[in-house]
Design a protein with these regions (language model features):
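Interdomain hinge/lid region at the active-site interface
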Residues: 209-212, 216-217, 242-304
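Small-residue-rich helix-loop
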Residues: 221-234, 242-243
Length: 380
């Protein structure tokens, strides 16, 4: 079983009086730097001067400096910029300004596992990887809790690498939820596999294949969209909340029987062999090499794939369907002219007859509410 750490296993004092440089102010950089600051750590954000992120960080009350200046003298450098630009920023602005004994922290194992970055031997190399998008991390932190995270130690020059990783996790609030220990290789390869085989690649391919099958057989594209894409969120929410069995027990018996009895016909032995091959290619570094090459060449292959996806029938139909659910803001009503204050009524003298007020009609009696029929037992 995995080793899981909690609040009592981490100490923010480990980085008391230390300088933490966060490189980047995107989804992860923004959330992590602000949470670390609010947890009492001394944080400076390293950015390109004059960019939008620079202004955004300033507006959010962060100390900001050019990347090279932020790294100089820093005890911890958190590299929270996209995988594809880490190598260039490392060589040009981070590595030349490192001090001995500093800790280099990553939120993803890609750069170290696939040798995009090769740190010197006289620094700690750690990972603190929250399992959530940045905005959610920040929201949960402000609510007094935290999101789960992973930690790993690749290189322990000082002997304090794990303590520093746990301190960063506590600064984010992650130790309140639970922090799992892993390795850079395990995180990097499993993360890429999950994205490609299931979350981003597998699911979208399955959705499109289902949609195209129905449309090809003469079904209306709008109906196919609802059945193969729109309703997916309902199912995923049930799984995320309580696991597979929570989903099976909350769908109809027909859906449960059909799903369990036919799923191996779709994800069959051939599909599973393809997954094995995909994982082998990831572990061997084949995918990393291909991605780094495309990123360094201007992302031409990625852009071509994006264009093809954007022009697909399911995307065109999806825009139509989603527009049906848009809530348009009602036009602002014109302000009515201010009413004049009513004139004060003259006081009625004692003994004088009061002005007659028309009697109100009695409200009609409501018919007694009918009892709702008892619900049948069983699934919705």
């Amino acid at each position: 079983m995995a080793k899981i750490y909690h609040d009592s296993d981490a100490d923010l004092k480990v980085l008391k009086g230390k300088k933490v440089a966060v490189i980047g102010f995107g989804s992860q950089g923004k959330a992590q730097s602000m949470c670390m600051r609010d947890s009492g750590l001394d944080v400076v954000v390293g950015l390109r001067k004059g960019g939008k992120s620079w202004d955004d960080a300033k507006k959010n009350g962060m100390k900001v400096a050019p990347v090279a200046d932020a790294v100089k003298g820093a005890d911890v450098i958190m590299i929270l910029i996209p995988d594809e630009v880490q190598g260039k920023v490392w060589k040009g602005e981070i590595e030349p300004n490192l001090k001995e004994g500093a800790a280099i922290d990553f939120a993803h194992g890609f750069a170290i596992t696939f040798a995009v970055i090769k740190p010197p031997k006289n620094v700690d190399v750690i990972m603190m990887a929250p399992k959530s998008p940045g905005p959610m991390e920040r929201q949960v932190y402000l609510e007094g809790f935290g999101v789960p995270a992973l930690i790993a130690v690749q290189q322990d020059f000082t002997g304090n690498a794990k303590k520093i990783a746990l301190c960063l996790a506590k600064g984010l609030g992650a130790t309140k939820a639970g922090v799992i220990e892993t390795t850079f290789k395990e995180e990097a390869t499993s993360d890429l596999f999950g994205e490609q085989a299931v979350l981003c690649g597998g699911v979208t391919a399955l959705i499109e294949a289902g949609f195209n099958t129905l449309v090809k057989r003469g079904y209306q594209p709008e109906i196919a969209y609802f059945e193969c894409l729109h309703e997916l969120k309902l199912i995923v929410d049930l799984i995320q909340k309580g696991g597979m069995m929570n989903m099976w027990t909350n769908v109809s018996n027909t859906a449960e029987y059909g799903g369990l009895s036919t799923r191996d016909k779709v994800i069959n032995a051939q599909s599973k062999e393809a997954m094995e091959k995909l994982l082998d290619d990831i572990i061997a570094g084949k995918f990393a090499k291909e991605w780094v090459k495309d990123a360094n060449g201007g992302m031409k292959k990625l852009q071509a794939m994006e264009k093809k996806e954007a022009e697909s029938e399911i995307e065109v139909v999806g825009k139509e369907i989603r527009s049906l659910f848009e809530i348009k803001a009602a036009p602002k009503a014109k302000k009515a002219p201010a009413k004049k204050a009513p004139a004060k009524k003259a006081a009625v003298k004692k003994g004088a007859a009061k002005p007659s007020v028309p009697a109100k009609k009695a409200a009609p009696k409501k018919a007694p509410a009918k009892k709702a029929p008892a619900k049948k037992k069983g699934k919705a």
